[in-house]
Amino acid sequence: MRTIHSGDKKINRYGVVALALFTSQAQAGIVIGGTRVIYPGNKTEVAVSIRNPQKSTVSLVQSWVENGDKTHTAPFIVTPPLFRINPGEENMLRIVRTGGSLAEDRESQLWLNVKSIPAINDSQPQNNVLQLVVKSRLKLFYRPPGLEGDPINAYRQLSFTRNGSQLSVSNPTPYFVTFFTLKIDGHEIPEAENVPPKGSATFSLPAVTASTVTWQAINDYGGISQAESRNL
């Protein structure tokens, strides 16, 4: 049985396809309703849909929330934490805050982990079946009530400064800004992921003679924003 991890950034889909080509059948995972989760602070819970698109494979789904550094217990629970989902079925995960200390003047980022484990079909010969355990990590943003500004337009408020071979990005808003692309004179900065609220991030420049920065962000719904540009 093999484990495949997927996250918020781009994943190597060619590798997954290549694995499947070595077998006559490949048992894959479940479908999650969304690429990120927004938890409004004035809500008692949020729900995420889980669907099993397989025609004959039963899966066991395990879910939990964790902090990014994995050193502290996240103040959220997921119910049901473990359940069976039959082919063609859809179920809902309920995420509930259990307390804890989170910032009230800005967003906090956590992770929703969803692992799908396909059941072994005893009626099928196992020498031609690749069982894939798929673990997905979705960003979970806790958004306190009463934050100023519009999260949809937060990416427009970023400011950029060139310091030698480094690009500094400042975010004055209380919202995380997650990049879809960040380019300098048309050259993408592949390590650019996000800028924390009321914080900054630094990335290496592909060229020290850069003059124009262009970027797009990922919004609450997983969509891509319009491109913004600034002169350095």
What are these regions (language model features)?
Residues A28-R51, D150-S159:
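Beta-sheet-dominated interaction scaffolds and their linkers
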Residues V31, S49-I95:
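Surface-exposed binding patches on compact interaction domains or structured appendages
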Residues K55-V61, D105, P174-F179:
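Short acidic/proline- and small/hydrophobic-mixed sequence motifs that coincide with surface turns
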Residues I50-Q54, L167-T173:
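Asparagine-centered strand-capping/turn motif at beta-strand->loop junctions
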Residues A74-S101, H187-S211:
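Intrinsically disordered, low-complexity Pro/Gly/Ser/Thr-rich segments with frequent PxxP/GP/PP motifs
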Residues G100-L147, S211-L232:
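Terminal connector regions
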Residues T23-Q25:
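N-terminal signal peptide c-region/cleavage motif recognized by signal peptidases
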Residues R2-G15:
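Bacterial N-terminal signal peptides that target proteins for export
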